[in-house]
Amino acid sequence: AFTELERVLVRGCGLARPGWLDAAEAAWADVRAGGPVRHAVVPVWRRPWMVLGRDTFAGDVLARLGVRHLYSGHPERYPRIPIQELTARGADLVVLPDEPYRFTADDGPEAFPGLPAALVSGRHLTWYGPSLAEAPAALTAALSAAR
């Protein structure tokens, strides 16, 4: 992602290399997924339930943090999956971003009884740009706090 960002910003747009790109590269260079791999369902919408599927930036970010999302092999990037299938999939974690759908402690976790829920910043999970410098720390903290 960093090479592509530099290509677009510096070579494509003729801008100076932004300082946040250096900070983001440094932040992610130190990331090493430690401990056991978590297996997660990652909804991005409700009514209907939609989750991360194949080839997504957010899926790659989570993988770097030791979280494998269970629909990474789905033919669609954001498949619609019935809640009954999501809860039966065998996840040990549900990751609930606050965008594009705004999942909260009161809206989302209740659909996954008995499953720890990590409420994460959608900006840190899905946005290219300056937030990438803060993303490893912010997402790791949210994943560690999953209840």
PLM ranges: what are they?
Residues 1-147:
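N-terminal ligand-binding lobe of clamshell/alpha-beta domains
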